[in-house]
Amino acid sequence: MEPEPEPEQEANKEEEKILSAAVRAKIERNRQRALMLRQARLACRPYPTGEGISTVKAPPKVIDSGGGFFIEEEEAEEQHVENVVRQPGPVLECDYLICEECGKDFMDSYLSNHFDLAVCDSCRDAEEKHKLITRTEAKQEYLLKDCDIDKREPVLKFILKKNPHNTHWGDMKLYLKAQVIKRSLEVWGSEEALEEAKEVRKDNRDKMKQKKFDKKVKELRRTVRSSLWKKEASGHQHEYGPEEHVEEDSYKKTCITCGYEMNYEKM
């Protein structure tokens, strides 16, 4: 009669089974990771290099420059530089981004690719929070200069889009409104300072408009007066009243309209 296994031995066997399964899973994960790293390295090699193949480079051609020295002619193959398009390697688990809105991991998204903003496509709010605005609006509404947009680090990211008003015009530059607001606060310091600057500019703009308006009114009045004076000077005809006796043979008539007096004598 065989002795029954002790409970302690059975527990050790179960632990060995669980441990072996965990080890096998870890080995499999390491193997998959090694394969992915190998694929990433291979993707960085656009052309395979064959073993045992050697190339013999011909001596460069020498050209007399006529100035007392010789120059070497570059080969056409050396002058032509091909643009090698390299496919990005696979995204590893450690390369995942964490969404600022929902906290979930994601590989890439519209906002992360174009504006370096870690927000997944599911959480993107194109109408409000992640709205895009034009460069003109960014300069007028948030009082940013070209240097604030293009020179100040980090340079604001943008996308190009066809102008909806006229396709023949240049492409529009669209910026992320949240990043524009952040840059505006960096420039002006606070929202209150920005609003004060807006009020000052508005007052100056209104003063300039009023000044231009007053100048136009003044010119218009001058033009009207000049035209009336010319009309009166060229088209007025005297309408004299009754004749008045002044002395002996002298008489006069007075214009009813302008008061001009005409003196004359009668023989």
UniProtKB/Swiss-Prot annotation:
A zinc finger (unnamed) spans 99-123. GO terms for cellular component: DNA repair complex; DNA replication factor A complex; nucleotide-excision repair factor 1 complex; nucleus. Keywords: DNA damage, DNA repair, DNA-binding, Metal-binding, Nucleus, Zinc, Zinc-finger. Coiled coil: none annotated. PROSITE patterns: XPA_1 (PS00752), XPA_2 (PS00753). GO terms for biological process: base-excision repair; nucleotide-excision repair; nucleotide-excision repair involved in interstrand cross-link repair; nucleotide-excision repair, DNA damage recognition; UV-damage excision repair. A motif (Nuclear localization signal) lies at residues 25-46. Belongs to the XPA family. Involved in DNA excision repair. Initiates repair by binding to damaged sites with various affinities, depending on the photoproduct and the transcriptional state of the region. This is DNA repair protein complementing XP-A cells homolog. It comes from Xenopus laevis. The gene is xpa.
